[in-house]
Amino acid sequence: MVIRLFCAAGVSTSLLVKKMEEAAKEKGKDVDIVAYPFTEMERVIEGVDVALLGPQVGYQLARAKEICDPKGVPVDVIPMQDYGMCNGMNVLKFAYKLAKNK
């Protein structure tokens, strides 16, 4: 599954990406997870299965849906607690749930 995380600068989610990759490996899931600044979303959304926004750019959800909906990419804001605690397993589950419901 191709998952893209979008935050303010693309840096703050790097630890979460690592934790998600570890969780995926533990579960035997094949994932491609990369973090980008929100400003790059339009450029990198092609071929993505799920787009996740960091809580700090959650106010951009409506704009993100304008970009993602026409491409059939589900998008939502990562729950604050899971983001803050860098809970890779919960965020990975959140991504899979979004993909399943698209």
Report residues per predicted region.
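Conserved active-site segments centered on acidic
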Residues: 2-38
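Short acidic/histidine-rich motifs immediately flanking catalytic phosphotransfer sites
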Residues: 45-50
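Generic structural signal for helix capping and beta-alpha/helix-loop junctions
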Residues: 13, 41-43, 85
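Short, well-ordered alpha-helices that flank and scaffold nucleotide-derived cofactor binding pockets
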Residues: 18, 22-25, 66, 93, ...
